[in-house]
Amino acid sequence: MFSPRTEIENLRREINRHNQLYYVQDNPEISDSEYDALLRRLKELEEAHPELVTADSPTQRVGAEPLKAFGIVNHPYPLLSLANAFSDTELEAWYLRVKKLLGNAAFQIDCEPKMDGLAVALTYRNGKFTTGATRGDGFQGENITRNLRTIHSIPLNTEEDAPPVFEIRGEVYLPKEGFAKLNRERADKGLSLFANPRNAAAGSLRQLDPSVTAERPLDIFIYALGYAEDSLLPDSHWQILEYFSRLGFKINPRNRLVNTLEEAKEYYREMAENRDSLPYEADGVVFKVDSVSLQQKLGDAGREPRWAIAYKFPAEQVTTLLRKIGISVGRTGTLNPYAILEPVNVGGVVVKQASLHNEDDILRKDIREGDTVVIQRAGEVIPEVVAPVLAKRSPESKPFSMEETLFNPKLSRPACPVCGGEIYRPAGEAMHYCANVSCPAQFERQLEHFVSRGTMDIRGIGESLSVILAQEGLVKNVSDLYYLTAADLLKLPRMGEKSADNIIKAIADSKSRPLDRVIFGLGIRHVGNETAALLSSRYGDIWALAGAGLDELQTIPDIGAKIASSIKAYFSEEKNIAVIRRLETAGVKLASDQKPSYKPLPLSGVEFVVTGKLDSLSREEAQQKIRSLGGTAKDNVTKATRYLVVGADAGSKLAKARSMGVKELSEQEFINMLEQS
């Protein structure tokens, strides 16, 4: 007769072995009922002896108390994103670039299906799974350890010869069969259906109650080692994955190691042809240089490794009926045509609408109401109308006309679909506009823009709340935001005290945003974030900018007659000046920390490009310093580029700059130039 401790330890070993056989090797030795009997006996013993329960017991995969929120995990080594290729030509360019950087040295290529799931990092210490985190922004992720413990193909402990501390990375996914079953169960319960397996996997992993996650048939494939301490591992990605497979981790059996570019292309073609028959969603193939030492030699370019690339599958195309061409109103009065479609599933997402850009684009493609059209999700994300199916076109169809579509019989003229204002199309522009500056739809979009992350970044006020605030009359111009109270917000439906307090705090916090954000947030036509930064550094004060003349504005690099006229027109409107005065009264910062300068700044007219990693400041900080001194910071080298600031691991921009004779500056030379300016 075994002691309870010994029987518990034996049961755990046996159950873990059967988990490995069933979930990882797909080779079960016992029936489900026999497995359930083992697990039931272990639960009975642990309930009788709670002091013997451990975190890595198979019984602990389910049943933990719900969390109130996820904690944050810092990734010791960033989870980088991958550069994309969309054609054989782009794949060949990557291959030749790698070959050149390696001095034409031969290298093998790992080929792996690009799973459409959620990337996670799993940390093990002394053989035990201790922490699991989402990818997040690559540097920080959410702590979802308890939810990951419910996935049977993730070992809770490893073999004795595993490294003492290591992080391994994988893709959590929901198999197609499991996804279909999950949606059938939700339909039976009257619940909303998941749009695609990726959304279902994401929603499952982010449940605060791990028992909900445990009910979902999630799985995982390990695709990379993050790091390992005190361990001599092979200099081969392929062999490292084989090693971790022996430790009990699940590796995709469709991975392949090849020696040539042609073999890599053949692998891609095979995967693309068999995409629909795969038991999981995949949106491409990942190619990696196999040698770890060569990976380290190649390094990273920004947030992408040079030694890997994702070759995406072609966008999935389907046909559906274009019921109607609708028109929406943008924040600057643009009238934006869009397709209203018979709902259709494209790549796992139900698409009901798609952008049509402008009248010229519609006429170029000859898209008409009532057409059967080809739809694709560009980059697997944005729905796009590719073309009409002419063979199915009705002989009664008519070419699209913006003015006919917007014709208002009551007004006997084309009119804005929201306010009835007159419409116009400026010479040389593709867009039509609503002439009514008081159009409510324009203001709703303006408010959304003002509070968005890239401008005043007011957390808690998104698209839907912006519309409600405008329609309820609580906010009639952007300055009204700064006079709202929690009591005002509590009058709105489904608004709680805590949410109201958080929004008021976020509004107060936004008062100290930099001047360029305020300028961008005002929504001046043709003034994007880069132009706003130029204006901020040139004038340093909103009132100085408001008083600038047309000729003076056009002396600023990259500001021509059209932008200058738009700026002048904005500040000539008394209602806009009144809004700015109210912002000032509310305490919004309307001057930059830099002393205003009405003389040409030291770097006026000088264009810079920054490449590589700088030690003393980030690329964004370097660009900001350039702009603050009147210079222009661009992302690409052109004939207009005066200087290329070169940091560590400089990429293709360096070669291009040298071929064009652009002057190079080291980081120290760049800093010296800034200090002297």
UniProtKB/Swiss-Prot annotation:
Signal peptide: none annotated. Its EC number is 6.5.1.2. Coiled coil: none annotated. One of its GO terms (cellular component) is cytosol. GO terms for molecular function: DNA binding; DNA ligase (NAD+) activity; metal ion binding. The active site is at K114 (n6-amp-lysine intermediate). SUPFAM superfamilies: BRCT domain (SSF52113), DNA ligase/mRNA capping enzyme, catalytic domain (SSF56091), Nucleic acid-binding proteins (SSF50249), RuvA domain 2-like (SSF47781). One of its GO terms (biological process) is DNA repair. Its cofactor is Mg(2+); Mn(2+). Belongs to the NAD-dependent DNA ligase family. LigA subfamily. DNA ligase that catalyzes the formation of phosphodiester linkages between 5'-phosphoryl and 3'-hydroxyl groups in double-stranded DNA using NAD as a coenzyme and as the energy source for the reaction. It is essential for DNA replication and repair of damaged DNA. This is DNA ligase. The lineage of its organism: Bacteria, Bacillati, Chloroflexota, Dehalococcoidia, Dehalococcoidales.
